[in-house]
Amino acid sequence: MQFDAGKMNWLGSIAPAVETMAVWHTSPVRSIDDVRSREVVAGASARGAISFTYPAVMNELLGTKFKIVTGYQGGNEINIAMERGEVQSRNNTWSSWKATKPHWLKEQKLFVIAQAGPRARDLAAPSIEDLTKSPEDRQLMELAVSGTQFGRPFATNAAPADRVATLRAAFDATMKDPEFLAEAQQLGFEVDPVPGVKMQATVEKVLATPKTVAARAKALLE
């Protein structure tokens, strides 16, 4: 499904996505510095996919040495590949790790060495944005992680401004509704809302990305 993000009216997101890079326990790697000094095999689905984007961007901007192997049909296949020893690391959201592999975290079979996007309060791993130094590199990093704000988004197509304002207010009220929050907790959904106005500003910033930065990102991911 294709759509023009700039023409959408973004109402809000239930929670942003905190992206991570994690390594399997059999690897000696426990930090970003470790991946700067030794090669680590990272599993991914395809070039341009999120699972490819994060290790590729870290290689480009942070000097890591992820060897990215593509061809896996989704995250579950990459998880199995880690268990088999085919790969040693992968990208995934923090909420997904906690929901699908809590025993891996508890038993220290998996170590998160980096996070991206809004900082997770219950995760000590460093932020890759904070480690990016030059202004040019920061522009590329900001573009790469811009999607983390969207998480579980709500949006509508062309609509009058007053209707958009009403929908955004309704979304904001829902995010504070005790009944909704209780049900979300029961279902294990994290609620850390991102306002629609903030999402709209992010889209506008991405669309205004300098051509040189966009070209660099395209070359990196293709």
Feature locations, PLM:
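Conserved hydrophobic/amphipathic secondary-structure segments
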Residues: 1-151, 215-218
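A conserved hydrophobic position in a structured secondary element of the catalytic/binding core
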Residues: 23, 156, 175-176
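A generic structural signal for alpha-helix starts
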Residues: 27, 159-162
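An extracytoplasmic/periplasmic, membrane-proximal ligand-sensing/linker region
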Residues: 106-108, 112-113, 133, 162-222
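Ligand-binding clefts/hinges and TM-proximal coupling segments of bilobed small-molecule sensing domains
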Residues: 139-160, 179-193
